[in-house]
Design a protein with these regions (language model features):
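Conserved, single-site charged/polar hotspot
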Residues: 1-452
């Protein structure tokens, strides 16, 4: 197997503005540089007074070149969402998708990975952490592409809308259970945001360590019994690993299992039990990811990620009005005033898999973890590992058993499946090798080189 090229969808819109600091060759046979703008109109790409179905711009051979894209959104639907100008190596393609244009970056997988590990965390992170992240990002990409490319032709035939895959079932007046996963994009391999893997080209500097990490692990992927691992990862597990089936489809992966994020403290309470989960979440158990070390955190988190100060244990407070309006807005269901939020099922990390919302107008069980997080936040609640306390006003509400305030005390940041980025950063600082980090978070997996 030779090193693959990858196509990355960066942004979409009616108009896309980009620039070339040095000369690029266009697919229509011209050499161009400087600022350019393409516009979607009447089913065509309009550029320099002419119409096209597709355009591509390639750096000239031997020239160190990059292009810039304006108004790229990062952190889509997260609390730190913003737009910025981004820089990319490789080829730029402009295509038509629906009634808008999409900008696609064509780049080698190893160059892509250098950016991904720099975009997912600071490129100044420890070398062993960056090596581990290079392996899991490469594994995720190759495992997904093998599966998704087989589906791609079917998607093109059915013209299914380009979106995150999800499955759900709804039992009227009883339950709404939904999970979200990655699905094939019709016209490119992956997108550039957290839906796939966070990719920002060369916007943020790739340090010699990031380059070394990708080079040292070139072609390496995680394997389990002859298949590439589905190498999931999140920011902070909260001290315990979640299992795959509690977040996505009901399939168990033997390398994504219940375990404590520690080498010294092996015993993990049964967090499926409500009393044990309550105690776990309200305390601060020993774990690799239980750290406030600013040096380590600055290596793992980019500036906008550091806007989240509390991630191992956190609190969110809502007034009755705030919560009832939020749930109504996010779910599209009017529950009336919220009487209670009751855990129905927890996973192996204490994360809620199913949550019962009791209102004055109706009651409904929702899940899985991301649906719960989306329902209880304007973007994404840090995790679904939380317990609920209620406050009552002295007069009025208490007699009606209507809480005046809900306080959520939670653990971790993200789904908690697979590698814990904060925990892995601590392991790297403590001298663990990348192979040891990977075997800790993906027990039973092995390393294998797919290409030279």
């Amino acid at each position: 197997m030779t090193q693959p090229q990858i196509t990355v969808g960066i942004l979409s819109g009616k108009e896309i503005e980009f620039s070339f600091p040095v000369k690029f060759s266009s697919s229509v046979g011209t050499e161009i540089s400087g600022t350019q703008k393409v516009i979607y109109q009447d089913g065509k790409i309009h550029w320099q007074g002419k119409e096209y179905n597709e355009l591509s711009f390639t750096p000239q051979q031997g020239a160190p070149a990059f292009f810039e894209l304006k108004d790229v959104t990062i952190g889509i639907n997260f609390h730190w969402e913003r737009k910025e100008v981004q820089k990319f190596k490789g080829e730029l393609k402009i295509i038509i998708e629906g009634e808008q244009l999409t900008a696609i970056n064509v780049i080698s997988i190893e160059e892509y990975l250098t950016s991904v590990i720099s975009s997912e965390m600071s490129a100044t992170a420890s070398l062993e952490l960056l090596k581990a992240h290079a392996v899991i990002s490469r594994s995720w990409l190759l495992e997904k592409n093998k599966e998704l490319r087989m589906k791609n032709e079917e998607f093109k035939r059915t013209l299914q809308k380009d979106s995150a895959a999800n499955s759900s079932f709804f039992i009227p007046n009883s339950s709404f259970i939904k999970w979200y996963d990655h699905e094939a994009h019709r016209n490119f391999d992956v997108c550039a945001d957290d839906h796939c893997q966070r990719y920002q080209g060369i916007t943020r500097a790739s340090t010699p360590q990031a380059i070394e990490a990708v080079s040292a692990t070139r072609g390496e992927v995680l394997m389990y019994k002859g298949a590439i691992c589905d190498a999931r990862f999140s920011k902070c597990c909260g001290g315990a690993f979640e299992e795959f089936q509690n977040c996505w489809e009901n399939v168990k992966h033997p390398y994504l299992i219940r375990q404590r994020d520690s080498k010294t403290e092996k015993q993990l309470p049964d967090l499926n039990i409500e009393a044990e989960a309550d105690k776990w979440i309200r305390t601060s158990p020993v774990a690799f990811c239980n750290t406030q070390d600013k040096k380590i955190l600055s290596q793992v988190l980019n500036n906008y990620d550091q806007e989240t100060a509390d991630f191992y244990r956190w609190k969110v407070s809502y007034s009755q009005q705030e919560l009832s309006e939020l749930i109504h807005q996010r779910s599209g269901i009017d529950f009336g005033q919220i009487i209670d939020l009751i855990p129905v099922e927890r996973g192996t990390s204490g994360r809620l898999v199913r949550l019962k919302i009791i209102g004055t107008l109706r009651t409904l069980i929702i899940g899985k973890e991301l649906e719960i997080r989306r329902t209880l936040s304007t973007s994404h609640l840090y995790s679904s590992a939380f317990v609920v306390d209620k406050e009552y006003e002295e007069k009025g509400h208490k007699e009606d058993k209507i809480p005046s305030r809900f306080i959520l005390t939670g653990a971790g940041w993200g789904h908690g499946v697979g590698l814990c980025q904060i925990g892995a950063a601590v392991m790297g600082e403590q001298g663990y090798k990348y192979e040891e980090i990977l075997s800790h978070y993906y027990p039973g997996s092995t390393l294998e080189k797919q290409y030279q």
